[in-house]
Amino acid sequence: MLDLVAAFIALTTLLTYVNYRFIRLPPTIGVMATALVFSLIVQGLSELGYPILEVEMQEIIRRIDFSEVLMTWFLPALLFAGALHVDLSDLRSYKWPIGLLATAGVLIATFVIGGLAYYTFPLFGWQVDFIYCLLFGALISPTDPIAVLGILKSAGAPKPLATTIVGESLFNDGTAVVVFAIILGILQLGEAPTVSATAILFVQEAIGGVVFGAVLGYGVFVMMRGIDQYQVEVMLTLALVIGGAALAARLHVSAPIAMVVAGLIIGNHGRHYAMSDETRRYVDKFWELIDEILNALLFALIGLELLLLPFSWLHVAAAFALGGAVLVSRLLTVGPAILVLRRFRGANRQVPAGTIRILVWGGLRGGVSVALALSLPLGPERDLILSLTYIVVLVSILLQGLSIGPLVRRIYAGQPLEKSEGAH
C-alpha cells in the first residue's frame, strides 16, 4: 500500500511541476490536462509495441479505489478546507440564491438531465432504464468550484458571484449524494419506497449531517478555546475531519454536509474567539496546503483514469450531447432562481449583471460525479454511465474551465464592481 501511495504522490508531483514550469495553466486544470496527455502518451507507446508502461500504470490506478478515496477521505477534507475560508456573514447575505441552487437546483437538475438522457441514449443505440438515467442526473448535477474559483478571482468577478458559486458547491455535493443514495436505494430494492421512508432517509442524511457537523464543530471550538498551542489546535482540526468523516459514515449521516457545517463554525467562531493570531496563520496555511495537495492528487487521478476506461467515438459523441443536456438543465435551474430573486427581493445589488451566464458556464463538473458513477452496481449500465460521466467531466473542466476567465473579463470589463476576495 505504501509503495502505491509513494508512486502516485511522486507522479502527481512531477505532473504538477511540469504544468507550473512549462504549461502554466490554472493549477488543477493544468495537472489534469498534463495527466491526460501522459495517459495518451502511454497508450500511444502501447500501440507502438511498448505496452509495459501502460500495464504498470493500469495496475497502479486499478489498485486505487477512486470512489472510496474521494468520498471517504478527499471530499470531507476538501469541503472542510473550503468552508474554513468562507465568511459566514457573506453566506447569510446570499443565502437565497445559494439555498435555491444547492437544494431545489439539484433536484430539478436530476430530473431534467435524467429525462433528457432517457431520450438521448436510444439515439446512440442504447436502451437504458429510466432509473439509471435518474442516477446519471443525480451524479452529474453537483458543481465543482475548485478549478474555476481562482480564475474567477483573478478575472475580477464580483464578490456576490464568487460567494454564490462557492456556497452552492459546498452544499450541493451533500444534497446530490443524498439524492443519489435515495435513487440507488430504489434501484436495489426493486420498488419505490414510501414518501415517509424517503423523507426519513433525507432527514437522517441531510439534517443529521447538519446536526452532527454542528456538534463536532462546537466541540472542537470549545477545546481550542481552552488552549493556546497552535500545534495541538491544528491537530484538533485534522482529527475533526478524519475522525468526523469516519464517524459520520457509521452514524449514516452525510459526511460532506457535516464537514461543511463544522468548517463554517471553526472558520468563523473558532477563528474569532478561539484562535490567536499565530494559530490562525498556521491553521490557514495547513489547510491551504492540504487543499492544494488533495486537489492535485484528485485531478491527476481523474486524468489517469483514462487508462482504465474503454470508450469509443460513439461514447464521445454521446457525452457531448449529454454535456449539452447538463448545460440546458443548468440554465433551467439558474435562470428562474435568479429571475425570481430579482423580481421579489429587489436583488439587483446582490445579483450583478451577467450572473446567469457565469453561473451556467461556471458550473463545472468534477471528481464527485466520477466517484458516484464508480459506486454504481456492476453491469453494462455502470460501464456506460461511467465512461460518459468521465468524458462529460473532462470536457467540462477543460472547455468551461479554460474559457470562464475570458468570459468574466468580457462581461465585467470596465465595470466598477467589487472584486471577489478571500473570505478572511
Swiss-Prot record:
It is a multi-pass membrane protein. GO terms for biological process: potassium ion transmembrane transport; regulation of intracellular pH; sodium ion import across plasma membrane. The keyword Ion transport applies. The keyword Membrane applies. Its main location: membrane. One of its GO terms (molecular function) is potassium:proton antiporter activity. Optimum pH is 7.5. Almost no activity is detected below pH 7.0 or above pH 8.5. Inhibited by amiloride. The chain crosses the membrane at residues 3-23, 25-45, 66-86, 96-116, 130-152, 170-190, 200-220, 246-266, 296-316, 320-340, 358-378, 384-404. GO terms for cellular component: plasma membrane. Na(+)/H(+) antiporter that extrudes sodium in exchange for external protons. Also has weak Li(+)/H(+) antiport activity. Belongs to the monovalent cation:proton antiporter 1 (CPA1) transporter (TC 2.A.36) family. This is Na(+)/H(+) antiporter NhaP. It comes from Pseudomonas aeruginosa (strain ATCC 15692 / DSM 22644 / CIP 104116 / JCM 14847 / LMG 12228 / 1C / PRS 101 / PAO1). The gene is nhaP.
